[in-house]
Amino acid sequence: MAANGSTQLSQKEADIKMMCAAEVHLGTKNCNYQMERYVFKRRNDGIYIFNLGKTWEKLMMAARVIVAIENPQDIIVQSARPYGQRAVLKFAQYTGANAIAGRHTPGTFTNQMQTSFSEPRLLILTDPRTDHQPIKEGALGNIPIIAFCDTDSPMRFVDIGIPANNKGKHSIGCLFWLLARMVLQMRGTIRPAQKWDVMVDLFFYREPEETKPEDEDEVAPQAEFGLPAPEYGGGDQWTTAAIPDAAWPGEAQAPISAAPAAGSWNDSAAPAAAEGGWDAAVPPTTAVTNWE
């Protein structure tokens, strides 16, 4: 019993250290009256600090509720906040739940005429303020709701509120990683004293620029395909030196002489008969005028 207690205590301490490193304990400058019970203190700059011991206990409670659902497909984990979409997809991958990353389509839980209509048994959200539409629809359908709540988050229609920083990309990834590991431990997939081989970095939000490899630079085609640089022959032939007269061929074509200039229009010779029997062209008649 003592060994199990020490193992659980050491694991709890390690989780709290990880949450401190991911800034899970940092709240906002505003505090809802329903979140005051989870606040440890207030800093001089007005930022509220969460009690991470209560955050860890709420994570354990949420994991017990998730394990109580027989079919993981009846669980929907959703995040409209961009920082939580990657964490939502990873959580659904390891726990078997359904993930909705992005904007919530109104009527998904209430309108039976929609093709995306579903009736989940449990709804897990990242931010009650951002995901207010699924919270309202879940309340109309009597769906239990688990949400990560900041100090300024509204708690209406939220059944289990996990006090944590739900605005940082490291904080959201750390929370979903801890929740997924607790669920797998309670299901028996991994032992309680065993370290999970999945890194928490996989749950963090990544910028689109970070997904590209750093060494993706433009290279020359010959370097890419292993071809040598092209060599152009005839380098000695293309010279700018003057060519001597003796190098030119001896038999050159005689230049074409210019036609003799006629004195007037009437002095020009009449055209000869064309080949093939055609007669010579008749010269035009001169019009008689009275100008003298």
Swiss-Prot record:
Single GO MF annotation: structural constituent of ribosome
A GO-annotated cellular component: cytosolic small ribosomal subunit
Keyword entries, A-Z: Cytoplasm, Ribonucleoprotein, Ribosomal protein
Region (Disordered): 256-292
Domain of life: Eukaryota
Stretches of the chain forming a coiled coil according to its record: none
InterPro entries noted in UniProt: Ribosomal_uS2, Ribosomal_uS2_CS, Ribosomal_uS2_euk, Ribosomal_uS2_euk/arc, Ribosomal_uS2_flav_dom_sf
UniProt-listed SUPFAM superfamilies: Ribosomal protein S2
Biased composition (Low complexity): 269-281
HAMAP family documented for this protein: Ribosomal_S2_euk
Function text: Required for the assembly and/or stability of the 40S ribosomal subunit. Required for the processing of the 20S rRNA-precursor to mature 18S rRNA in a late step of the maturation of 40S ribosomal subunits.
Stated family: Belongs to the universal ribosomal protein uS2 family.
Protein name as catalogued: Small ribosomal subunit protein uS2
Annotated gene: LRP
